[in-house]
Each structure stands twice: as structure tokens, then as C-alpha cells.
């Protein structure tokens, strides 16, 4: 892999987004794929059924420290785990070539974690809170 082949990749942090007044979800909507850590944003991105990869460089530290919200986080992370620069370049190359080995698993997990996909979740949340429209 040559670094110049990936010159169009931009790495951003939450602080950068906030400082520039950007909306993460608008960016996600126009993204072909997502590379993330343990943030729950991938559950939202999964609704678009696009490739997701996960960085796992501090897995043990995170597990032993803050911990995960689910017992088996790897079950829900339907995408490759990036541990090396080669893994990163491989994922980007696969996305660029339209290859998606994780689509079936992602669809299965999406059905579990995003049960309602009818755009009425706000209405349901208000009803649970005792607010009727």
C-alpha cells in the first residue's frame, strides 16, 4: 500500500467536529464506510447498512477500565477489527472495490439492535414518557 493512495482520507475527532460546528450525523449520512472504536455511533451507522471497521488497539484496557455496555461486544461489532496499518489499508481497499464480507452479519445485528426502523421512535419515546401527541 502507498500512503498517497489514501490521501483523500480525513481523520477527525469529536473536538474537531465541535470546533468547526459540524454535525456528525450529516457526515455519516454521506460516508461510504465508518472506522470507529467503542462508540455507540456504529449502531446508528448500521441503519444504512454500510461497511464498518473497528479499532481495537486498547481493547483490554477499555474492558478492564470503563467496561462495555454489553456482555459480548464482539458479537455486535459486525466488521473487521483493525489492529495494524495493513488491516486499515485492507479495509479501505475492500470498501473502494465494493467488497463487503460483513454485510450479512451486519444485517443480522441491525435487526436486533435497531428493532424499530419505521421513523417513529421519537413518538414512542414521548409515549413512554407520558406525552401524547
Language-model-derived ranges and their functions:
Residues 117-133:
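C-terminal alpha-helical cap of glycosyltransferases
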Residues 23, 80, 117, 121:
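Soluble or luminal CAZymes and related metallo-dependent hydrolases
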Residues 4-10, 40-113:
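Catalytic binding pocket for nucleotide-activated donors in carbohydrate/polymer assembly enzymes
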Residues 1-43:
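Donor nucleotide-activated moiety binding/catalytic core segment of transferases
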Residues 18, 36, 78-79, 116:
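Short N-terminal micro-motifs specific to bacterial/archaeal maturation
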Residues 1-4, 106, 119-122:
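Short secondary-structure boundary segments
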